[in-house]
Swiss-Prot record:
UniProt keywords, alphabetically: Cytoplasm, Hydrolase, Protease, Serine protease
Similarity section: Belongs to the peptidase S14 family.
Gene that encodes it: clpP1
GO biological process, any: protein quality control for misfolded or incompletely synthesized proteins
EC id: 3.4.21.92
Catalytic activity of the protein: Hydrolysis of proteins to small peptides in the presence of ATP and magnesium. alpha-casein is the usual test substrate. In the absence of ATP, only oligopeptides shorter than five residues are hydrolyzed (such as succinyl-Leu-Tyr-|-NHMec, and Leu-Tyr-Leu-|-Tyr-Trp, in which cleavage of the -Tyr-|-Leu- and -Tyr-|-Trp bonds also occurs)
Organism whose genome encodes this protein: Rhizobium etli (strain ATCC 51251 / DSM 11541 / JCM 21823 / NBRC 15573 / CFN 42)
CDD domains, alphabetized: S14_ClpP_2 (cd07017)
UniProt name for this protein: ATP-dependent Clp protease proteolytic subunit 1
Subunit structure, interactors included: Fourteen ClpP subunits assemble into 2 heptameric rings which stack back to back to give a disk-like structure with a central cavity, resembling the structure of eukaryotic proteasomes.
């Protein structure tokens, strides 16, 4: 992680007050761009939620969430989902690279009409997975909780994508990989962006 942080470019800006330097992500945050890059976990979720809440200070302007994620922890993803819905500023989502599992869940949770993917993006939907060791009675409790989570996520996919619960229940039974075109057909996104001119906000 430390080596990766050292590779983050710095941007230098000149102003009447002198010279200021920013890491590239902080500079993009000033343009209301947030990156979800890599695994979804508690640390990443906390950072994204904090940035969403910070940018809500100007609720009339959209926030752009760029996603390139293989997915990860359901609870961490749901924290970001709930924060996206909680704040007043609209959140536009864009998949660049891949949006799998919780990554695709957050992609489809963007503002209706403002969910997009780049042409060669890969999207994956599937049911949540989990594991637990312990007493048989406790394992049954955890199994019931996973089933409840599956039902809740299936319902949310269906609501956001304008399809039936049964469609997503069947679609998520096993790993389902999608191209950008297939994600468009399923309603996870509304647009496939090839050049910047396709949108004024992303």
């Amino acid at each position: 992680m430390r080596e990766a942080m050292q590779l983050v470019p710095m941007v230098i800006e000149q102003s009447s007050r002198g010279e200021r330097s920013f890491d590239i992500y902080s500079r993009l945050l000033r343009e209301r761009i947030i990156f979800l890059n890599g695994e979804v976990n508690d640390t990443v979720s906390a950072l994204v939620c904090a940035q969403l809440l910070f940018l809500e200070a100007d609720p009339e302007k959209p926030i752009n969430l760029y996603i390139n994620s293989p997915g990860g922890a359901v609870t961490s993803g749901l924290a970001m989902y709930d924060t996206m819905r909680f704040i007043r500023a609209p959140v536009h989502t864009l998949c660049m690279g891949t949006a799998r599992s919780m990554g695709s869940f957050l992609l489809m949770a963007g503002e209706p009409g403002e969910r997009a993917a780049l042409p060669n993006a890969s999207i994956l939907i599937h049911q949540p997975s989990g594991g637990f060791q312990g007493q048989a009675s406790d394992m049954l409790i955890h199994a019931e909780e996973i089933l409840k989570t599956k039902q809740r996520m299936t319902r949310l996919y269906a609501e956001h994508c304008g399809r039936s619960y049964e469609d997503f229940e069947r679609g998520m039974d096993r790993d389902r990989f999608m191209t950008a075109e297939e994600a468009l057909e399923w309603g996870l996104i509304e647009r496939i962006l090839k050049v910047r001119e396709d949108t004024s906000s992303l």
